[in-house]
């Protein structure tokens, strides 16, 4: 293998690992949920007024959007490449996080965290692993996939 290609593969793998690290925001839901539940229980003006039984709904919507969003994200990654797909994912996750930072409404969190963040994560994941794997021979793809998603 050419040294320039090997170096490029390492850079892409490091970038893909960084993307996946950032996409771990999905798994921070329990922190958000605890803060929302505390706000509901305190009943402070301007705080969250959700029904406690619906606290997991934004996470569930995010997981569904993540799963089903992989289909168009994969098609975009195949057609336009990982840069465009990763950028779309980053913009969606960023927009969702900005949106939820400015609202306490249940619908706002369903759209912001559920739809935007969930779909953005799908686009990010679909860009990262395939891009890294393409730079290595077939006998290394399992190792590289493991490094990227670890």
What are these regions (language model features)?
Residues 36, 114, 123-137, 144:
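Intracellular juxtamembrane helix-capping segments at the cytosolic ends
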Residues 113, 147-150:
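Hydrophobic alpha-helical segments of secondary membrane carriers
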Residues 6-28:
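Pair of pore-lining "gating" transmembrane helices in MFS-fold secondary transporters
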Residues 52-53, 138-148:
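Loop-to-transmembrane helix entry/capping segments in MFS-fold secondary transporters
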Residues 68-107:
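Conserved MFS/SLC helix-loop-helix module at the cytosolic interface between two early adjacent transmembrane helices
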């Amino acid at each position: 293998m050419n040294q320039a290609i090997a170096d490029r593969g390492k850079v892409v793998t490091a970038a893909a690992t960084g993307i996946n690290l950032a996409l771990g925001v999905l798994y921070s839901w329990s922190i958000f949920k605890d803060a929302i539940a505390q706000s509901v229980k305190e009943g402070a003006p301007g705080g969250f007024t959700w029904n406690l039984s619906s606290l997991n709904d934004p996470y569930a919507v995010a997981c569904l959007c993540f799963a089903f969003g992989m289909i168009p994200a994969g098609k975009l990654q195949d057609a336009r490449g990982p840069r465009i797909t990763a950028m779309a994912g980053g913009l969606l996750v960023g927009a969702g996080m900005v949106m939820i930072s400015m609202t306490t409404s249940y619908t706002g969190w369903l759209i912001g965290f559920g739809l935007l963040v969930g779909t953005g994560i799908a686009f990010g994941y679909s860009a990262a692993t395939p891009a890294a794997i393409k730079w290595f021979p077939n006998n290394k793809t399992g190792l590289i996939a493991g490094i990227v998603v670890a």
